[in-house]
Amino acid sequence: HVVVEKPLAYSTEHAMAIARASRIGKADCMVNWPTTWQASVRLGQKLVSEGVVGKVYRFQFRNPDSMGPFSYGQVMTDRQLGKEWWHQEAAGGGSLLDYCCYGTILSNWYLGEKPQGVYGLKANFNHRFGDAEDYASLMVRYPEAVSILEGTWNTISSGYPSGPIVWGEKGAL
C-alpha cells in the first residue's frame, strides 16, 4: 500500500497511471491532505454538515502565512533556485499545486458536491528564475455554491483570515 503526499499527481494522465498500477498491484493508494488533520478544519466541516450556517453559498480558502519554498530559510542563488523542482512547472512545481490543492479538497469536502466548472489564473510575479507560477487563484462553480481559492508564495497573510471560511444562509464560519 502507498500513501502519497498531496496532490496525487501533476496531471490526469499521471493520476490514471497511479490508479492503474494500484489496481494491477492490488494495493491501496491514499493521498495525505495535512490540512484535514487540523482540529479547526475538522470542527468547521462538522458544523457545516450539521447545518449550523444553513445552506452554504460560498467557501473560501487562502493558504496561510507562507512564502512557499522560501519558508525554510535556504540561501540560494537565482540560478540554483531555478533548478529546484519547486520552480519547474513540468516537475509539479508552482503555487497552484502546492497550495490551491488544499482549498480544492476542502471545498469538495465541506460542500459535499462535485464541481461543475472552474475558472483560474496563475502568474509568476516574483520568482522569475523558474517557469512555475508563484500565484494562483481559482473560482469553482458547484451546483449550489461557489468556492474561491487562492494559493500564493508572494503575499504574507498576517492578520488576514486564510480559511476555510464558509458563508451560508444563517451565518458564517
Please identify what each model-predicted range represents.
Residues H1-T36, G51:
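Beta-strand-loop-alpha-helix segment that lines the small-molecule cofactor/substrate pocket
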Residues E5, R62, W167:
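Alpha/beta-hydrolase-fold catalytic nucleophile elbow
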Residues E13, A39, S158:
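Residues that form or flank phosphate/diphosphate-binding pockets in enzymes
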Residues A15-I18, S40, G44, L149:
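Hydrophobic packing residues within well-ordered alpha-helices of enzyme cores
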Residues A27-D28, T35-F129:
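Predominantly a Rossmann-like dinucleotide-binding segment in NAD(P)-dependent oxidoreductases
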Residues P34, F70-G82, S137, S162-L173:
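C-terminal glycine/acidic-rich active-site capping loop/insertion
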Residues D98, G103-L173:
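Contiguous beta-strand/loop segments that form the cofactor/metal-binding neighborhood of enzyme cores
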